[in-house]
């Protein structure tokens, strides 16, 4: 079998993609996403107190943001947080673990920062009698997005517009950030 010759990658191939952004951009978003996810992490930890995977994912992405951990190990931590989400039964705990997994996955692809919407969903699921729980969490997230975080989020292309609660939250957050 003949091997294809190695070729130089083009400038376009070396540039960060629209959903990926630069490593510096991903570091900025990672800290914000981890802060958002951490607000609901206790919902997971209450259901699965010995499972540290979502917390380790947040610790890992913060280490990435400080330049102390490379992308590969953080991706593995993100995958582990998502595995933890699949293994816990409580819907609020699932959403909280997914928020942690997406925060960690931001190290690899900036668009995962939009996964903070899972934290808002977790807050809503944990407070079914509070009709404002989701909106209040989204407001907190946006209020705690620094001007640099907002500018970085604006670099992302508009999210897809499929139906469902998660997509609606992501699209609402994107519109609110894009608007100012």
Residue ranges of each PLM-predicted region?
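C-terminal binding/interaction regions
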Residues: 2-3, 17-21, 126-180
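Structured binding/interaction patches within domain cores
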Residues: 2-142
């Amino acid at each position: 079998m003949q091997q294809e010759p190695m070729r130089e990658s083009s400038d376009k191939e070396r540039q960060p993609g629209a959903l990926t952004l630069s490593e510096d951009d991903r570091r900025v978003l990672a800290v914000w996403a981890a802060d958002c996810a951490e607000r609901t992490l206790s919902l997971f930890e209450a259901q699965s107190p010995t499972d540290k995977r979502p917390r380790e994912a947040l610790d890992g992405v913060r280490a990435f943001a400080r330049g102390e951990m490379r992308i590969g190990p953080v991706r593995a931590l993100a995958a582990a947080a998502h595995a933890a989400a699949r293994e816990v039964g409580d819907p609020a705990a699932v959403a909280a673990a997914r928020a942690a997994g997406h925060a960690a996955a931001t190290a690899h692809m900036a668009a995962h920062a939009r996964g903070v919407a899972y934290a808002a969903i977790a807050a809503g699921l944990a407070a079914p009698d509070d009709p404002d729980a989701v909106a209040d969490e989204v407001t907190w997230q946006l209020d705690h997005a620094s001007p640099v975080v907002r500018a970085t989020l604006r670099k992302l292309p508009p999210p897809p517009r499929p139906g469902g609660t998660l997509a609606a939250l992501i699209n609402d957050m994107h519109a609110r950030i894009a608007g100012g």
